[in-house]
Amino acid sequence: MLIIPAVDMKNKKCVQLIQGNPDKKHVELDNPPEIAKKWVEQGAEMLHLVDLDGAINGKRVNDEFIEEIIKNSGVPVQIGGGIRSVSDALYFIEKGAEKVILGTVAIQNPKIVREISSIVGKEKVTVALDAKDGKVLIKGWTEKTDYSPVQIGKILENMGAGSILFTNVDSEGLLEGINVLPTKELVDNLNIPIIASGGVTTVEDLLKFKEIGVYAVVVGSALYKDMINLKDAILASK
């Protein structure tokens, strides 16, 4: 199981938000490329980059840092946040991103997944599913749909998604530990890799995800607040 450190960017700073709220930050650090370099030096085999400006208001202001990290990190990079069109996705793939992460656009228009995966290959297309109380959220967690993660996950899989990045919003950013059952439902019902995210605070949390068969776990706040040591986490996940 891969451990993937998160490098979330807002206004050209590396941040970690509480429950996705842009006004509530655990962490705010300068120089995201240096942060990314630190995680790679500690053994990260992949990086998870999010452009929060792109995600929140549709304006990508962090491309320069994103491109620098892709170019210099020496490990595969997956990038999400504000990717709302085929051209947005192709832009980052052409810059060297290993995977692009689609959010709301893929849930509202699943055909875009087929279009992108037919050009770049399904292994390069991840769709982010965020859920609360068993229902998928869209538009930065501001709207709740009537559909479960498994219902939408199956549609996306059929459309050519190569993997699903699943965030249990009930846990995200609270540093209170995890409930793996919603993630397990996806693992059990889909045939593509599931990347888990949200609420990890201990190596024990990571082992719970490993036990249910997830492909990878994205870890954010717990790394930045020194609750988890990345080297220990990687060792435990092997």
Swiss-Prot record:
InterPro entries: Aldolase_TIM, His_biosynth, HisA_bact_arch, Isoase_HisA-like, Isoase_HisA-like_bact, RibuloseP-bd_barrel
UniProt pathway annotation: Amino-acid biosynthesis; L-histidine biosynthesis; L-histidine from 5-phospho-alpha-D-ribose 1-diphosphate: step 4/9
UniProt-annotated catalytic positions: D8 (proton acceptor), D130 (proton donor)
GO molecular function, one term: 1-(5-phosphoribosyl)-5-[(5-phosphoribosylamino)methylideneamino]imidazole-4-carboxamide isomerase activity
Subcellular location: Cytoplasm
Pfam families listed in its UniProt record: His_biosynth
Documented EC number(s): 5.3.1.16
Single Gene Ontology BP annotation: L-tryptophan biosynthetic process
Top-level taxon of the source organism: Archaea
Entry keyword set: Amino-acid biosynthesis, Cytoplasm, Histidine biosynthesis, Isomerase
Annotated GO CC locations: cytoplasm
Recorded catalytic activity of this chain's protein: 1-(5-phospho-beta-D-ribosyl)-5-[(5-phospho-beta-D-ribosylamino)methylideneamino]imidazole-4-carboxamide = 5-[(5-phospho-1-deoxy-D-ribulos-1-ylimino)methylamino]-1-(5-phospho-beta-D-ribosyl)imidazole-4-carboxamide
NCBIfam families: 1-(5-phosphoribosyl)-5-[(5-phosphoribosylamino)methylideneamino]imidazole-4-carboxamide isomerase, PRK13585.1
Alphabetical list of PANTHER family matching this protein: 1-(5-PHOSPHORIBOSYL)-5-[(5-PHOSPHORIBOSYLAMINO)METHYLIDENEAMINO] IMIDAZOLE-4-CARBOXAMIDE ISOMERASE
Recorded family membership: Belongs to the HisA/HisF family.
Record-linked HAMAP family: HisA
This protein's name: 1-(5-phosphoribosyl)-5-[(5-phosphoribosylamino)methylideneamino] imidazole-4-carboxamide isomerase
Encoding gene (name): hisA
